Amino acid sequence: MAKFDILEDLKWRGAINQETDEEGLRKYLAEHDDLALYCGTDPTGDSLHIGHLIPFMILKRFQMAGYHPVILIGGGTGAIGDPSGRKTERTLQTAEQVKHNEEKLTAQMKKLFGTENFEIRNNAEWLGKMNLLDFLRDYGKFFQVNNMINKDVVASRLENGISFTEFSYQILQAIDFYHLNKDNGVQMQIGGSDQWGNITAGIDLIHKLDGSDRPAFGLTIPLMLKADGTKFGKSAGGAVWLDPEKTSPYEFYQFWINQDDRDVVKYLKYFTFLSREEIEDLAEKTEKEPWKRAAQKRLAEEVTKFVHGEEGLKEAQIITEALFSGNVKSLSVPQIEQALKNAPSAEATHEAKNIVEFLVETKIEPSKRQAREDVKNGAIYVNGERQDDIDFIIEPDSDFDGKYVIIRKGKRKYTLVKIK
């Protein structure tokens, strides 16, 4: 049986930007089954976001092909900060912040990769034990300052200034690759396109210290841009997090289901494990019947299931269907809070009140005249039910444990009224 050509699959999926030695890597893969590869992430926050999925999807594909992925948490480098892609110096974190973030990220990674044939390392294990003289004697002499200055990540910062702390980051990242290569048999590093200089610095260090025939490879991923030219990864509300407390499964699902027709096939290739045949079929459906949004629905299902599991996907679909159909009464209080987290909100008391007065007092309607007109025209829904009687009394304690009243005006304009 022919061996699965993972590099060819990655190329088809548009997942490769640059490779340091494709011929050497192909030869290694043909002759060995033990490739180990890693990517690093510094614990600058307490949650991963969908930008992290870009390199992690590559690791996951290698894992599914039988290879050994390693994620390196930068407990050491995270205390300094990677200058890549930044115009200004990072604010340094306390040791307590770094430790807290490490624990949160580790839990999220284990959820994505499981515990079989997967490893999480922390560069504080070796960088934290290194003193300044060891750093200068054992590694510093292998780095030429003129070469370091010419690296894109440094050159772009020279005009406004870069501290020695951030300037030395590429040496520390090179030491990481050398350490993992020598002590853990990790042969390849992957990263974003802005990491090319750091990755090649690591390969150079490995070859200088352990010989040019030592297997060491690098692969970078293209910058993910949307069809409109903007950077992928943000929603209208900001970053899309993997932590369900920061971005609920419903919001996460909505981010993917709302992708542009021009982007959806690219994202299916990159962020799902669907076969080429399935993706080509969905591409054809998008071209012929774009209004059905079959590709977007499948994309949202696959990525939500990968990140939040079957339960998170089911929750997101239940909320989506309830909001689309208007049957919000079927939702639980936590589901309501997920669904309408970013909707306009208002406050009211527990007192029963005439619908017209309620709409004006909560500022959903600008005047009693407008409120009466909208109610008579059937444009107002209370807790999912149309109310066209201007004498209708809203009883705030009747639904949702007396915590909320949900007003819908027209087809999709929801307001979450919190009962105090």
From Swiss-Prot:
L-tyrosine binds at residues 38, 169, 173. PROSITE patterns: AA_TRNA_LIGASE_I, S4. ATP binds at residue 234. CDD domains: S4, TyrRS_core. One of its GO terms (cellular component) is cytosol. Transmembrane segments: none annotated. Residues 353-419 form the S4 RNA-binding domain. One of its GO terms (biological process) is tyrosyl-tRNA aminoacylation. Keywords: Aminoacyl-tRNA synthetase, ATP-binding, Cytoplasm, Ligase, Nucleotide-binding, Protein biosynthesis, RNA-binding. One of its GO terms (molecular function) is tyrosine-tRNA ligase activity. It catalyses: tRNA(Tyr) + L-tyrosine + ATP = L-tyrosyl-tRNA(Tyr) + AMP + diphosphate + H(+). Catalyzes the attachment of tyrosine to tRNA(Tyr) in a two-step reaction: tyrosine is first activated by ATP to form Tyr-AMP and then transferred to the acceptor end of tRNA(Tyr). NCBIfam families: tyrS (TIGR00234). PANTHER family: TYROSINE--TRNA LIGASE, MITOCHONDRIAL (PTHR11766:SF0), TYROSYL-TRNA SYNTHETASE (PTHR11766). This is Tyrosine--tRNA ligase. The gene is tyrS.
